[in-house]
A protein has these predicted regions:
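N-terminal pre-domains immediately preceding structured catalytic cores
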Residues: 1-129, 133-152
Length: 152
């Protein structure tokens, strides 16, 4: 099905595909159409939404347009896409209460104009990521502010 959509959008199919299932709170990694691994994830506490400031996880086709965090230790905390020099367990109790962005950032860009690209529905401009979390115990249940959270 996604191949038809890609063709309609004038995009090329990729050998690697990440399929987020919000209902099941799972992220599946496919290679050449075959499932390699299924990961537990957490999407937004809010209903799915592509609209800015909704804090909902966007739907539709996306691409990973930026990878941040290569070489950083597991649990490294990022603020503004920059490592702060501390892993989550080293942060204050107050800071650890927040959903921190940890380990890596895969920044997403929508591929569907008017759905998740452009105007008030632009995933890239909303800074929606796939990233690690300091609250791994919540994986499998909606708990983010729009991003897809995964284990470190």
């Amino acid at each position: 099905m996604y191949e038809k959509k890609l063709s309609f959008l004038g995009c090329q199919a990729s050998e690697h595909l990440l399929l987020a299932d919000i209902d099941q709170q799972q992220l599946e990694h496919l290679f050449q159409g075959r499932s390699l691994k299924v990961y537990k994830m957490s999407s937004s506490k809010q209903p799915p939404s592509c609209v800015e400031n909704s804090l909902g996880t966007p739907w539709g086709l996306h691409e990973v347009c930026q990878k941040i965090g290569e070489g950083q230790p597991s649990g490294m905390v990022f603020e503004g896409r920059v490592p702060i020099g501390a892993i989550a367990s080293e942060c204050s109790d107050e800071k650890q209460k927040k959903n921190l962005i940890t380990s890596r950032i895969l920044r997403l860009a929508g591929l569907e104009k008017g759905v998740n690209q452009g105007g008030v529905v632009d995933t890239f401009e909303r800074y929606v990521y796939i990233h690690g979390t300091n609250h791994e115990q919540n994986l499998g249940s909606p708990s983010s502010s729009g991003c897809l959270q995964m284990s470190n």
